[in-house]
């Protein structure tokens, strides 16, 4: 979106956000599929993400009680940004970020396949307008 083109610290924050979300998926999978110990998960988070041990501990304890939540969150983010990229590519100058967000966020919490259809319908409505 070009949001951080002139903001190196903002870009760094965004990249940190992506790293954190990716590491959450690794830790969630490590705990629930690879049977990592609590300590292994905390150590991974500290080493890979640079988080303080106390923060990493709280995050790991949360993932222990909600299997798959971290991965589903990241999947939702990936699908959402994919829908937005598709809309921008198909609509070009007719793409309006505010209208896009209104359309896809108005459906609330919804399965990702439904969200994809909402995005596709919104794109189609803008192409014919």
Give residue spans per PLM region.
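N-terminal maturation segment of proteins
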Residues: 1-129
């Amino acid at each position: 979106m070009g949001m951080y083109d002139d903001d190196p610290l903002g870009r760094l924050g965004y990249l940190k956000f992506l790293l954190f979300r990716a590491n959450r998926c690794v830790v969630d999978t490590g705990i629930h599929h690879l049977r990592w110990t609590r300590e292994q998960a905390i150590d991974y988070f500290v080493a890979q993400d640079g988080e303080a041990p106390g923060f990493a501990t709280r995050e790991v304890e949360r993932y222990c009680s909600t299997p798959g939540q971290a991965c589903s969150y990241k999947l939702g983010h990936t699908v959402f940004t994919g829908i937005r990229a598709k809309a921008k590519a198909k609509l070009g100058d007719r793409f309006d970020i505010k209208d896009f967000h209104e359309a896809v966020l108005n459906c609330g919490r919804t399965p990702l396949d439904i969200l994809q259809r909402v995005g596709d319908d919104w794109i189609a409505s803008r192409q014919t307008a």
